[in-house]
């Protein structure tokens, strides 16, 4: 019986405690002139994630999105969103925890951030903007690979 209780205590657990908007900004630096031009934007998306340990098994993960739309040489709009979540994560190895914080949690947060960006752009009276899905697993794998390459480079230097 004690063995079963011990196994349950070690079983991986993942819980979302809260998802919230930490910060947001929407700017149209060239309005109203930008509305007078033909709409042919170049949209750029920058992503960043970070995490903070709040307690032994509780983490805050912050997904930052910056969307910049340029119409010709002029910036049509700049939208910055920080979507955050508080997650309870227990029973994972260090590698599994790093993956959860760097890929799984951002995957959970992205739909909320994408919706917020779309709403802000719409309220700015620009045409609808639907951000494409992001493969955070691939981005995290690329990040790990870059860190390993940098560590190898330092070791050989």
Swiss-Prot record:
Pfam families in the cross-refs: SecB
Ion transport among keywords: no
SUPFAM superfamilies: SecB-like
Assigned keywords, A-Z: Chaperone, Cytoplasm, Protein transport, Translocation, Transport
Gene Ontology MF terms in the entry: unfolded protein binding
GO terms of biological process kind: protein folding; protein tetramerization; protein transport
Keyword Membrane: no
Superkingdom of this protein's organism: Bacteria
Signal peptide start and end residues: none
UniProt subcellular location: Cytoplasm
InterPro entries from the UniProt entry: SecB (IPR003708), SecB-like_sf (IPR035958)
GO cellular component terms given for this protein: cytoplasm
Main location: cytoplasm
Record-stated family: Belongs to the SecB family.
Function: One of the proteins required for the normal export of preproteins out of the cell cytoplasm. It is a molecular chaperone that binds to a subset of precursor proteins, maintaining them in a translocation-competent state. It also specifically binds to its receptor SecA.
Quaternary structure and interacting proteins, as annotated: Homotetramer, a dimer of dimers. One homotetramer interacts with 1 SecA dimer.
HAMAP family, alphabetized: SecB
Protein name: Protein-export protein SecB
Gene it is expressed from: secB
């Amino acid at each position: 019986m004690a063995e079963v209780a011990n196994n349950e205590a070690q079983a991986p657990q993942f819980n979302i405690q809260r998802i919230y908007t930490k910060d947001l900004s929407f700017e149209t630096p060239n309005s109203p002139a930008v509305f007078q031009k033909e709409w042919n934007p170049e949209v750029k998306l920058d992503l960043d994630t970070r995490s903070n340990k709040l307690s032994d098994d509780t983490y805050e993960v912050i997904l930052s999105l910056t969307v910049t739309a340029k119409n010709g040489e002029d910036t049509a709009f700049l939208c910055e969103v920080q979507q955050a979540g508080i997650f309870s994560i227990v029973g994972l190895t260090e590698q599994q925890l790093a993956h959860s914080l760097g890929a799984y949690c951002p995957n959970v947060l992205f739909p909320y951030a994408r919706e917020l960006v779309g709403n802000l752009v719409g309220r700015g009276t620009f045409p609808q903007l639907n951000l494409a899905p992001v493969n955070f697993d691939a981005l995290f794998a690329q990040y790990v690979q870059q860190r390993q390459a940098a560590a190898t480079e330092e070791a050989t230097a």
